Amino acid sequence: MTVYNDIIEKLKRKKIHMTLIDPASQDIESSGRIAEAAERAGTDFIMIGGSTRINSELMDKTIGAIKSKTSLKTIIFPGSPEMISPRADAIYYMSLMNSRNIDFIIGHQVKTSLFLRQLAIETIPMAYLIFEPGMTVGRVGEANLIKRDDSDTALLYALAAETFGMKLVYLESGSGSPTYVSENVIKKIKEYVKIPVIVGGGIRDKNAAEKLAAAGADIIVTGTIVERSRNVYEALQEIISSI
């Protein structure tokens, strides 16, 4: 079964939680331990990426460490073309649709298309939308930030993504964001869009996760919390049980 089909099958039964591990935020062995704790807590998939300062060697070693500790499928969340590894189960073939820089919309994707085909890694087409405050990813990605409660603009982007044939749409507030995407934005998108909606950024506790899931988010992503928590299992288990 492909990773994407696995996602769709799981969504028929429940909401999904994904743990984002940034290889640049801790040593390789710690990445493996985080993944192990996340699996015990009930996370469904491991995303690897986030930073732009990651090369393919670090990705290879990090994914290897994660796979040695967990049976969960791994998905690359690329911040640059250098973050491709054949060891992952899949990669988000993502377009930062509200960027001012064409490289983030389609340029990097064109440059890596042949390489990805040669690797025979599963690609999952995904629209990536960055909302205020955006944090580092908004700055680096040169995003025209969508206001966190601007449901009309968000809906138009999401509809365009679905019309393009994207299989997922990711609503991002930015790693370490003090706020998360408004529930009203998610509700509006879910009224019209049939592809799964991922929400990440600013989700620090079960209350936030519960609200976003109730609003219609299909997939909840948490990353900063696993980097900062002394007990990854407890921190994630509380969030995962709430969705």
Swiss-Prot record:
This is Geranylgeranylglyceryl phosphate synthase. It comes from the Archaea. The lineage of its organism: Archaea, Methanobacteriati, Thermoplasmatota, Thermoplasmata, Thermoplasmatales. The keyword Amino-acid biosynthesis does not apply. Keywords: Cytoplasm, Lipid biosynthesis, Lipid metabolism, Magnesium, Metal-binding, Phospholipid biosynthesis, Phospholipid metabolism, Transferase. Mg(2+) binds at residues 22, 51. Belongs to the GGGP/HepGP synthase family. Group II subfamily. One of its GO terms (biological process) is glycerophospholipid biosynthetic process. It comes from Picrophilus torridus (strain ATCC 700027 / DSM 9790 / JCM 10055 / NBRC 100828 / KAW 2/3). One of its GO terms (cellular component) is cytoplasm. GO terms for molecular function: magnesium ion binding; phosphoglycerol geranylgeranyltransferase activity. Its main location: cytoplasm. It catalyses: sn-glycerol 1-phosphate + (2E,6E,10E)-geranylgeranyl diphosphate = sn-3-O-(geranylgeranyl)glycerol 1-phosphate + diphosphate. It is an enzyme of class 2 (transferase). The keyword Kinase does not apply. Pathway: Membrane lipid metabolism; glycerophospholipid metabolism. It is found in: Cytoplasm. Prenyltransferase that catalyzes the transfer of the geranylgeranyl moiety of geranylgeranyl diphosphate (GGPP) to the C3 hydroxyl of sn-glycerol-1-phosphate (G1P). This reaction is the first ether-bond-formation step in the biosynthesis of archaeal membrane lipids. Sn-glycerol 1-phosphate binds at residues 170-176, 201-202, 223-224. Its EC number is 2.5.1.41. InterPro entries: GGGP/HepGP_synthase_I (IPR039074), GGGP/HepGP_synthase_sf (IPR038597), GGGP_HepGP_synthase (IPR008205), GGGP_synth (IPR010946). Its cofactor is Mg(2+). PANTHER family: HEPTAPRENYLGLYCERYL PHOSPHATE SYNTHASE (PTHR40029:SF2), PTHR40029.
